[in-house]
Amino acid sequence: MASYRRQQVSPYLLFFIITSSQIGVGVLGFQRIISKDAGYDAWISVIIAGLVVNIVVWFMYKLLMNAQGDIIDAHKKFFGNIVGSALSLLILIYYVIASISVLRLYIEIVQVWMFPSISTWLLSIIILLLCYYIVSGGFRVVVGIAFLSGLFTALLWALLFHLPHKYIHMDNILPIFDHSFKDLLLSAKNSIYTMAGFEILLMVFPFIRNGNSSQKFAQWGVAFSTLVFTLSAFTTFLLLSEKQIEHVIWARIYIAKLVHFPFLERFEYILISSFLIKVISILALLLWSSSRGLKLIFKWKQKYTLIFISVISFIVCQLLETRYQINAFADYTSRISLYIFYVYIPIFSIVFMIMKSGKAK
């Protein structure tokens, strides 16, 4: 980890890395997905999902601290160079898939709500070029964007939670706990895509100064993200009926239409436009992680791996044309995330700790 020292950042910045990578485009429309199983109780499911993420982050820290490096180092130490590199490559492929999903979802929102005739390829190129410029500046620049994104998130959601009181229906959420625990768990499972982003820790850990003592900032980051998701779901349920939620794809954008200020109209346009910094922050972290991972595995220069991944992302974005295809791709991403980060990583962490303690004896 000594070779990373010049690029390392302060531990508190991990809070902004986690929150900026977790709070993305999914927060604009996840309410419809989580309410399918738990109805208005789905906000409880978000809290459950957040607690599960906190546990997974704890496992990640145990793994990374024992490996004294990133996930690639952990895999190589346990499985050897060839098998370890192959397993690491699967995680890097997930990062690429996740970046494509985030990019295409945001472009779809812009096309539906703002510019219906704008081409997918044009927006893809503009956003990917911005991300390429940021990632080329190094990890500290990527973290700087994440920091700005985190500050922006706090301001944006403060405005977005300025609810029009005449539309609030408190009886919507009553009675609480009206669904079974099984329904709550199914709803929590459906929030996996929205809660994703914390897995970036597997690659950024060596770049955090005093990484072993930085866990509290990661856990607080997850807790803050969970709070934002919970408030987002809760306030959406106060304003919209279950029928409305079922048919509105992006509930928070729909609610933004109800927000009015004396000096500002069409708040949803401001919301969508401002969300670009969130998208760029997430993409920069994902592209940095995947391009650096390829550099470590194949010994290529990172600028070439970054160009390669950006081109792949651009091409796949053009292939996802319909709402069904985009939604199916997001579901596919969520499924991969479930098996890798909620199942494999905790198991691998436990086995790695056992192996480490066995060698110590």
Protein language model regions, located:
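Membrane-interface interhelical connector segments
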Residues: 239-268
